[in-house]
Amino acid sequence: MGMLFIFVMNLPNIARPDTKIHRPVVGMPGISVKIGDHCYHGLCDIGASVSAIPYKLYQEIMNDIAPAEIEDIDVTIKLANRDTISPIGIFRDVEVLCGKIKYPTDFLVLGSPQDDFCPIIFGRPFFNTVNAKIDCEKQTVDVSFGDESHEFNFSKFSRKLHEKEFLEMN
């Protein structure tokens, strides 16, 4: 039976707790999108397996786009705080303008109150569709389709979103 010794030359420098790299607090990863005639902020939640909107937002969107009904869906959602909710239904193939490209997106419609600043939650299926890359160090979300791409900087994610600001971002 032999023994294995591993010598680490710079062990004191590696193990020192006071050499931690401190980074600034990362902002909320979000993107600004347009649905119908309205601009919205959307939270990029890579932990979410679905995209979701509140019922109030669904009603707002319905007034701007071609009539589409909510389909019944037998799903229960488990939230981060371990609560469970059942959505009202699913709103399919909603055209979401993200950058300069419109992407079809399915949203679960929830009966929960609307967050006026960021009413939309974008989950992993949306990120797959838009080929999203989230970079926490640069605080950016890149979306692309073919040769077209757009970068959102969420360190500048403001609490106010107007049509003019949306057009400037694109």
Which stretches of residues belong to each language-model region?
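Proline- and glycine-rich low-complexity segments
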Residues: 1-170
